[in-house]
Design a protein with these regions (language model features):
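General small-molecule cofactor/ligand-binding pocket signal
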Residues: 42-46, 109, 190, 222-224
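Glycine-rich phosphate-binding loop
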Residues: 65-83, 218-241
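Short, well-ordered secondary-structure micro-motifs
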Residues: 144, 200-202, 233-235
Length: 241
Protein backbone atom coordinates (compact mmCIF):
# COMPACT_ATOMS: atom_id res chain seq x y z
CA UNK A 1 0.00 0.00 0.00
CA UNK A 2 1.40 3.39 -1.01
CA UNK A 3 1.28 6.31 1.42
CA UNK A 4 -1.56 8.05 -0.41
CA UNK A 5 -3.55 4.92 -1.22
CA UNK A 6 -6.55 3.63 0.67
CA UNK A 7 -6.12 0.65 2.96
CA UNK A 8 -7.87 -2.19 1.18
CA UNK A 9 -9.76 -4.58 3.45
CA UNK A 10 -11.31 -7.86 2.29
CA UNK A 11 -14.55 -8.24 4.26
CA UNK A 12 -15.75 -11.81 4.84
CA UNK A 13 -18.89 -11.67 7.03
CA UNK A 14 -19.11 -15.45 7.30
CA UNK A 15 -22.16 -17.07 8.89
CA UNK A 16 -24.67 -16.47 11.66
CA UNK A 17 -23.34 -14.11 14.31
CA UNK A 18 -20.47 -13.21 11.98
CA UNK A 19 -22.87 -11.43 9.66
CA UNK A 20 -24.56 -9.72 12.60
CA UNK A 21 -21.38 -8.30 14.14
CA UNK A 22 -19.76 -7.28 10.86
CA UNK A 23 -22.03 -4.27 10.36
CA UNK A 24 -21.08 -2.52 13.65
CA UNK A 25 -17.42 -3.48 13.10
CA UNK A 26 -17.47 -1.64 9.78
CA UNK A 27 -19.17 1.34 11.40
CA UNK A 28 -16.34 1.55 13.94
CA UNK A 29 -13.76 1.52 11.15
CA UNK A 30 -15.66 4.21 9.28
CA UNK A 31 -15.70 6.42 12.38
CA UNK A 32 -11.95 5.90 12.79
CA UNK A 33 -11.48 6.83 9.15
CA UNK A 34 -13.57 9.98 9.56
CA UNK A 35 -11.51 11.20 12.51
CA UNK A 36 -8.02 10.19 11.35
CA UNK A 37 -6.17 12.39 8.83
CA UNK A 38 -4.75 10.67 5.75
CA UNK A 39 -6.43 7.37 6.56
CA UNK A 40 -8.78 5.87 4.00
CA UNK A 41 -10.34 2.43 3.97
CA UNK A 42 -11.64 0.58 0.94
CA UNK A 43 -13.91 -2.37 1.72
CA UNK A 44 -14.63 -5.26 -0.61
CA UNK A 45 -17.08 -7.90 0.62
CA UNK A 46 -16.75 -11.54 -0.41
CA UNK A 47 -18.38 -14.89 0.30
CA UNK A 48 -17.01 -17.52 2.67
CA UNK A 49 -18.43 -19.97 5.15
CA UNK A 50 -20.90 -22.78 5.69
CA UNK A 51 -23.81 -21.23 3.80
CA UNK A 52 -21.61 -20.72 0.76
CA UNK A 53 -20.45 -24.33 1.06
CA UNK A 54 -24.04 -25.55 1.21
CA UNK A 55 -24.88 -23.61 -1.96
CA UNK A 56 -21.73 -24.31 -3.98
CA UNK A 57 -19.77 -27.18 -2.42
CA UNK A 58 -16.82 -24.87 -1.58
CA UNK A 59 -16.07 -23.02 1.66
CA UNK A 60 -15.09 -19.98 -0.41
CA UNK A 61 -14.78 -19.27 -4.12
CA UNK A 62 -11.49 -18.69 -5.93
CA UNK A 63 -12.47 -15.02 -6.24
CA UNK A 64 -12.47 -14.68 -2.45
CA UNK A 65 -9.00 -16.22 -2.20
CA UNK A 66 -7.73 -13.87 -4.91
CA UNK A 67 -9.26 -10.89 -3.11
CA UNK A 68 -7.57 -11.91 0.15
CA UNK A 69 -4.24 -12.23 -1.66
CA UNK A 70 -4.52 -8.70 -3.06
CA UNK A 71 -5.98 -6.94 0.00
CA UNK A 72 -3.95 -5.27 2.75
CA UNK A 73 -5.98 -7.03 5.44
CA UNK A 74 -8.80 -9.52 5.94
CA UNK A 75 -11.73 -8.69 8.23
CA UNK A 76 -13.28 -12.06 8.99
CA UNK A 77 -16.53 -12.78 10.79
CA UNK A 78 -17.40 -16.04 12.52
CA UNK A 79 -17.73 -18.93 10.07
CA UNK A 80 -19.42 -22.30 10.36
CA UNK A 81 -22.81 -23.77 11.20
CA UNK A 82 -23.18 -26.93 13.33
CA UNK A 83 -25.79 -28.29 10.92
CA UNK A 84 -23.55 -27.92 7.83
CA UNK A 85 -20.51 -30.18 7.71
CA UNK A 86 -17.95 -31.77 5.43
CA UNK A 87 -18.37 -35.48 4.61
CA UNK A 88 -15.94 -36.34 7.44
CA UNK A 89 -18.32 -34.56 9.86
CA UNK A 90 -15.96 -31.63 10.58
CA UNK A 91 -17.36 -28.11 10.34
CA UNK A 92 -16.78 -25.66 7.52
CA UNK A 93 -13.88 -23.45 8.64
CA UNK A 94 -12.46 -21.20 5.91
CA UNK A 95 -10.74 -19.22 8.66
CA UNK A 96 -8.41 -22.16 9.28
CA UNK A 97 -7.88 -22.69 5.55
CA UNK A 98 -6.82 -19.03 5.26
CA UNK A 99 -4.24 -19.55 8.00
CA UNK A 100 -2.51 -22.19 5.91
CA UNK A 101 -2.81 -20.24 2.66
CA UNK A 102 -1.18 -17.11 4.08
CA UNK A 103 1.00 -18.64 6.82
CA UNK A 104 -0.91 -16.81 9.56
CA UNK A 105 1.01 -18.57 12.31
CA UNK A 106 0.54 -16.08 15.18
CA UNK A 107 -2.96 -15.66 16.55
CA UNK A 108 -2.92 -12.51 18.72
CA UNK A 109 -5.78 -12.31 21.21
CA UNK A 110 -5.75 -9.33 23.58
CA UNK A 111 -7.87 -9.45 26.71
CA UNK A 112 -8.83 -6.26 28.52
CA UNK A 113 -11.43 -5.39 31.08
CA UNK A 114 -14.21 -3.25 29.62
CA UNK A 115 -15.22 -0.47 32.06
CA UNK A 116 -18.49 -1.36 33.74
CA UNK A 117 -18.44 -4.99 32.58
CA UNK A 118 -18.45 -7.59 35.39
CA UNK A 119 -15.63 -10.13 35.55
CA UNK A 120 -15.42 -13.51 37.33
CA UNK A 121 -11.70 -12.94 37.98
CA UNK A 122 -10.94 -12.03 41.59
CA UNK A 123 -10.00 -8.37 42.03
CA UNK A 124 -10.30 -7.56 38.33
CA UNK A 125 -12.25 -4.35 38.85
CA UNK A 126 -9.58 -2.93 41.17
CA UNK A 127 -6.44 -4.23 39.48
CA UNK A 128 -7.51 -4.38 35.85
CA UNK A 129 -6.72 -6.93 33.14
CA UNK A 130 -4.12 -6.56 30.43
CA UNK A 131 -3.42 -9.98 28.96
CA UNK A 132 -2.43 -10.95 25.43
CA UNK A 133 -2.50 -14.57 24.29
CA UNK A 134 -0.33 -15.35 21.26
CA UNK A 135 -1.13 -18.79 19.91
CA UNK A 136 0.58 -20.70 17.11
CA UNK A 137 -2.23 -21.32 14.63
CA UNK A 138 -0.91 -23.60 11.89
CA UNK A 139 0.82 -26.47 13.69
CA UNK A 140 0.10 -28.59 16.72
CA UNK A 141 -3.05 -30.55 15.96
CA UNK A 142 -4.00 -28.07 13.23
CA UNK A 143 -1.28 -29.68 11.10
CA UNK A 144 -3.41 -32.83 11.09
CA UNK A 145 -6.47 -31.08 9.69
CA UNK A 146 -8.02 -33.35 7.06
CA UNK A 147 -5.41 -36.06 7.64
CA UNK A 148 -6.73 -37.83 10.72
CA UNK A 149 -7.57 -41.53 10.64
CA UNK A 150 -10.89 -42.70 12.05
CA UNK A 151 -11.97 -46.32 12.40
CA UNK A 152 -14.91 -47.96 14.13
CA UNK A 153 -12.86 -48.31 17.29
CA UNK A 154 -10.55 -45.33 17.45
CA UNK A 155 -9.41 -42.05 15.93
CA UNK A 156 -5.88 -40.71 15.52
CA UNK A 157 -4.55 -37.23 14.81
CA UNK A 158 -0.86 -36.31 14.70
CA UNK A 159 0.47 -33.27 16.56
CA UNK A 160 3.33 -31.48 14.79
CA UNK A 161 5.77 -28.94 16.26
CA UNK A 162 8.64 -27.71 14.08
CA UNK A 163 11.63 -25.56 14.91
CA UNK A 164 11.02 -23.19 11.97
CA UNK A 165 7.46 -22.31 12.93
CA UNK A 166 8.10 -22.26 16.68
CA UNK A 167 11.08 -19.93 16.38
CA UNK A 168 9.22 -17.42 14.24
CA UNK A 169 6.35 -17.53 16.75
CA UNK A 170 8.76 -16.84 19.61
CA UNK A 171 10.54 -14.06 17.72
CA UNK A 172 7.18 -12.44 16.97
CA UNK A 173 6.17 -12.75 20.63
CA UNK A 174 9.38 -11.22 21.98
CA UNK A 175 9.16 -8.31 19.54
CA UNK A 176 5.50 -7.81 20.44
CA UNK A 177 6.39 -7.74 24.14
CA UNK A 178 9.20 -5.26 23.56
CA UNK A 179 6.81 -2.94 21.70
CA UNK A 180 4.42 -3.07 24.65
CA UNK A 181 7.24 -2.16 27.04
CA UNK A 182 8.25 0.73 24.78
CA UNK A 183 4.71 2.10 25.13
CA UNK A 184 4.97 1.99 28.90
CA UNK A 185 2.81 -1.11 29.30
CA UNK A 186 3.68 -3.94 31.67
CA UNK A 187 5.10 -7.01 30.03
CA UNK A 188 6.19 -10.51 30.86
CA UNK A 189 6.37 -13.24 28.25
CA UNK A 190 5.34 -16.68 29.46
CA UNK A 191 5.43 -19.92 27.46
CA UNK A 192 2.36 -22.04 28.21
CA UNK A 193 2.67 -25.68 27.23
CA UNK A 194 2.34 -29.32 28.32
CA UNK A 195 6.07 -29.90 28.74
CA UNK A 196 5.34 -31.71 32.00
CA UNK A 197 3.69 -34.52 30.01
CA UNK A 198 4.68 -34.55 26.32
CA UNK A 199 8.13 -34.68 24.70
CA UNK A 200 6.89 -32.48 21.84
CA UNK A 201 6.09 -29.67 24.27
CA UNK A 202 9.38 -30.15 26.12
CA UNK A 203 10.99 -29.51 22.72
CA UNK A 204 8.73 -26.46 22.31
CA UNK A 205 9.80 -25.06 25.69
CA UNK A 206 13.47 -25.75 25.00
CA UNK A 207 13.25 -23.68 21.80
CA UNK A 208 11.50 -20.89 23.72
CA UNK A 209 14.36 -20.75 26.22
CA UNK A 210 16.90 -20.69 23.39
CA UNK A 211 15.08 -17.79 21.75
CA UNK A 212 14.86 -15.88 25.05
CA UNK A 213 18.64 -16.04 25.36
CA UNK A 214 19.04 -14.21 22.04
CA UNK A 215 17.17 -11.13 23.23
CA UNK A 216 18.85 -8.29 25.16
CA UNK A 217 18.62 -8.02 28.95
CA UNK A 218 16.18 -5.14 28.50
CA UNK A 219 13.62 -7.64 27.28
CA UNK A 220 10.91 -8.36 29.89
CA UNK A 221 11.47 -11.39 32.12
CA UNK A 222 10.27 -14.68 30.73
CA UNK A 223 8.94 -17.87 32.19
CA UNK A 224 7.18 -21.14 31.43
CA UNK A 225 4.29 -23.01 32.96
CA UNK A 226 2.12 -25.99 32.19
CA UNK A 227 -1.47 -25.48 31.09
CA UNK A 228 -3.19 -26.74 34.29
CA UNK A 229 -1.05 -24.34 36.35
CA UNK A 230 -1.86 -21.53 33.92
CA UNK A 231 -5.60 -22.11 34.32
CA UNK A 232 -5.37 -21.93 38.10
CA UNK A 233 -3.08 -18.89 37.92
CA UNK A 234 -5.44 -16.97 35.65
CA UNK A 235 -8.50 -17.87 37.72
CA UNK A 236 -6.95 -16.50 40.90
CA UNK A 237 -5.37 -13.31 39.57
CA UNK A 238 -6.92 -9.97 38.80
CA UNK A 239 -4.15 -8.87 36.47
CA UNK A 240 -1.64 -10.43 34.16
CA UNK A 241 1.19 -9.00 32.10
Amino acid sequence: MKANDSFHIAVLPGDGIGIEVMAPALEVLKKIEATTPNLRFRFTEAAAGAIHYKETGKSMPDSTIKLCEEADAILLGACGMPSIRYPDNSEIMPQVELRFMFALYAGVRPCRLVPGAPSPIVGAAERGIDLVVIRESTEGLFASMGKGVVTHDDARETLVITRKTSERLFDFSFRYTQRRKARGLPGQLVCVDKANVFKAFAFFREMFDECAARYPPACPPTGSMSMPVRRCWCAGRGTST
